[in-house]
Amino acid sequence: MAKRVQVALTESIASLGKEGDLVEVAPGYARNFLLPYGKAMNVTPAVLKQIERKKEKEKIAADKLKQEALDFQTALSTIGRFTIKKQVGEDGVLFGTVTNGDVAEAIEAATKKEIDRRNITVPDIHNLGSFTAKIKLHPEVNAEVNIEVTS
């Protein structure tokens, strides 16, 4: 059975893991590829401390982003309803449809905070009325907003 060595990845490698991961690889792979090309470094107590500090900083940053998303979710629910004006034909049907871009513009106008339209899920809206759109603010935080379509 071949001996394996433990290395710390300095960049993400699809077959092994992401940056900062500790992985066990064959000695030849580490010696001939990972270490010379700077894709990994030998594990030492100093390297372990460095990786631990980096992971702590990343966790703090991720927690901060999640808290900002939760605060924005609360702000959206406080506002309650966003109004979008569209042109309407004689039979009350919209010219075109309400898109996620329209919803993003309405939210940005009301909150002064930009939201990526690709994170907004809007049902097919072809008539006037009230609808609900879902917004993904963070991988763990979603929000629902009410949309009022008027002429």
Curated annotation (Swiss-Prot):
SUPFAM superfamilies: L9 N-domain-like (SSF55658), Ribosomal protein L9 C-domain (SSF55653). GO terms for cellular component: ribonucleoprotein complex; ribosome. It comes from the Bacteria. Pfam families: Ribosomal_L9_C, Ribosomal_L9_N. GO terms for molecular function: rRNA binding; structural constituent of ribosome. Signal peptide: none annotated. Keywords: Ribonucleoprotein, Ribosomal protein, RNA-binding, rRNA-binding. InterPro entries: Ribosomal_bL9 (IPR000244), Ribosomal_bL9/RNase_H1_N (IPR009027), Ribosomal_bL9_bac/chp (IPR020594), Ribosomal_bL9_C (IPR020069), Ribosomal_bL9_C_sf (IPR036791), Ribosomal_bL9_N (IPR020070), Ribosomal_bL9_N_sf (IPR036935). PROSITE patterns: RIBOSOMAL_L9. One of its GO terms (biological process) is translation. The keyword Ribosomal protein applies. Coiled coil: none annotated. Belongs to the bacterial ribosomal protein bL9 family. Binds to the 23S rRNA. This is Large ribosomal subunit protein bL9. The lineage of its organism: Bacteria, Bacillati, Cyanobacteriota, Cyanophyceae, Synechococcales. The gene is rplI.
